[in-house]
Structure formats: structure tokens, C-alpha cells
Amino acid sequence: PGSDTAIMGIFGCDPRKYFSGRAPLELAASGGVMPEGGAAYRCNMVNLGGPEGAPFEERIMISHSAGSIEGEESDELVTWLFAQPDFAALAERAQLTVRPGSSFRHLAVQERADIAGIVLAPPHDHLNEKIGPLLPSGCANAEVLLGLMRKAAELLPGHPINKKREAEGKLPANCIWFWAEGKGAALPNFPARFGADGGVISAVPLCHGIARLVGLEPVSVPTATGEWDTDYEAKTAAALDVLAEHDFAAIHLEGPDEATHNHDLEHKIYSVECLSERVAKPLCAALRERGEDFRLLILSDHRTFMANGAHGGTPVPYMIYDSREMGPASGLGYTEKNGESGPFLESGVELMPRLFCL
């Protein structure tokens, strides 16, 4: 289970019908165009551990985000990497270019790419595992991508940014990791289906790509980080700005997920508390002050487990609040346990019609 298919479902797009890969959705966020016959991939900056001098296959996936590397450092590293003669020659033969992105998240676009049968593993689902069984496989093009990853592992450790990160006790971005391949994306129009236009506030390219493809406005907040320390007040204010002119706003918070991938229970709890105290409560209060009726949907796109830092596919609890209904409603608090006794939906695709009372 991934955020790509889950968030598509939340916006009413059945992933079984429309999903063709995560990277094309993120490419749409940047306004990029998929070349005919080409493919896009996520290109993560990652940290690999293991004994010094160990074969590449014996390395360990320590961090899918290179220790939540900052955007400026990450962009500089990936741009430098693709400019190094040995790496650039491999990338040119592969007809592959990079589009620097958000934090550890970059995109690679390949002309005339054959991805039939390719197997690329999501790094966040395999933390602290040996990478040998996770390396690209399944077709000749997988070997091309693997060659680029091997070369990156040779070159990146020596970059001054990584030396500086190590000196500061941070994880270096010592490799790249290709995954989330896809050929193209087209999604049904949200305003036409639900009779409401608006915007999506997020620090994550995936959400902005889905927004653009369904006909909603991607809204960026300069002080949003995509981590537990994001600017919650600014994201709430951005949603209120959208709702001043439109009928729909979505706020995406990545903090709980990233904290869990990093086995950081303290900041996972903190992020959830901030959702309640610094987003939901002030948002509702401001809308009431405006004298507007509204409905509010709160949910996570998927579960992420502290035990292993990986995603889970079991159903998530959701809550719908209607400002016009002042009665007790279900009388249940919003918890995983109470969610088990609430109305069960077979698919996330059913949520948006439920929010709009369709």
C-alpha cells in the first residue's frame, strides 16, 4: 500500500482503473511532460550502511530519505552527480535525465523506456534490510538503472556535502534509488464530478501532481517542510485562503508518516497532536466565525507501523464532521479502535461521494 494509490482513492479516482505508477503523478506536479514511449521514476537520495568495502549487494538500506536531507543540499548533490563525466555518460546512454525535486525526492525521466516486467522496490518498505534482493530486476532496462545506482554509490560519498553531513553526525546521501516507475497518467475531473473546485495544500509533489491531474489547484507553502516540524499555521491559513474563494480545500500532512519511517515515536505523536490543535481546531473555528456551513473529513491515507517503519494495508479510521449537525452523532472519539465499529467502506473511492453527500 502506498500514498499514490491511497490518495488517488481519496480524491475519488479508482487506482485499479487509473494508476500507472507514482512517478508520472509527481511529474505532473512540476508541469513536466512525459515523452512518448518514455517512463518516469522516483529517484530518492538514500543512505546505505554496511561494513566498509562490502559488495554493493550486501549494503543495508538505512534511510530512504538520507536522514531527511534538506532540499538545498539534496538538489545540489543530485545535480552534481548527473554532471560527473562517468555518471553522465551512463545517463546519456540510458537517455535518462533528472528533475531535482523536494527534499530527498527527485524524478528521473527516461526516453523510450521499456519497463515491462521491471521490479523496483520502495526503499521505505525495506529499512534495515540488505539491498541485494531489492535491486532493480525483471528486464534489461533494470540493469541500466542498477548500473547508475552502483556508480552513484561510488561517487556520492566523496562530495563535500556528505563529508560535512558526516562531521555533523548526519547520515550522508551516499546513493540514489530508483522506484515508482510509470508511463503516464490521466485522472477524472474533480470539479465536474463533485461540483466543487479548490486547492490542495501539501509539501509533497505526489499530492500536487494528483491535484493538477484532477483539476484542482496545487498550493505550495514556502515554510512547509513535509516533516513533523512543518508550518502547521501557514498550511491552515492557506486552506482558509482557498476556501475564501472556492468550495473545497485539502490539507496533506506528511509528518506522522515520515516520523514513523524514522522510528521517531515522539514526533509521530507530536504531528498527530498538531493536526488536532494547530490545524483542525483553528480551521473549524475560523469557518464558524465566517458563518459558513461546512463538512470536514479527517483520515490518513494508509497505516505506517512503528514496529518496522513500513506501510500497512489494513483499513484506516476516518471521521466526517458536519457543522449543521449539532447533535451527538456517533458519540465516539476519533481512534483506530472506534474506527473498527464505524461505517466500513469497501474502498477509499467511496469517501469523497460520502463527504459531498452524493
Report residues per predicted region.
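Active-site nucleophile/metal-coordination loop of metallo-enzymes that catalyze phosphate/sulfate
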Residues: 1-83, 310-313, 319-322, 328-358
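A contiguous, mid-domain pocket- or channel-lining segment that forms the substrate-recognition surface
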Residues: 22-159
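Active-site His/acidic residue clusters
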Residues: 51-63, 110-134, 214, 236-283
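Flexible, glycine/charged-enriched surface loops at secondary-structure junctions
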Residues: 91-99, 159-171, 221, 248-249, ...
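Anion-binding catalytic surfaces of enzymes that hydrolyze or transfer phosphate/sulfate esters
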Residues: 116, 183-267
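Loop-centered beta-sheet repeat module
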Residues: 129-197
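Active-site proximal loops enriched in glycine and acidic residues that flank catalytic Cys/His/Asp
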Residues: 222, 252-255, 264, 276, ...
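Metal-dependent active-site segment of extracytoplasmic phospho-/sulfohydrolases and closely related
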Residues: 271-314
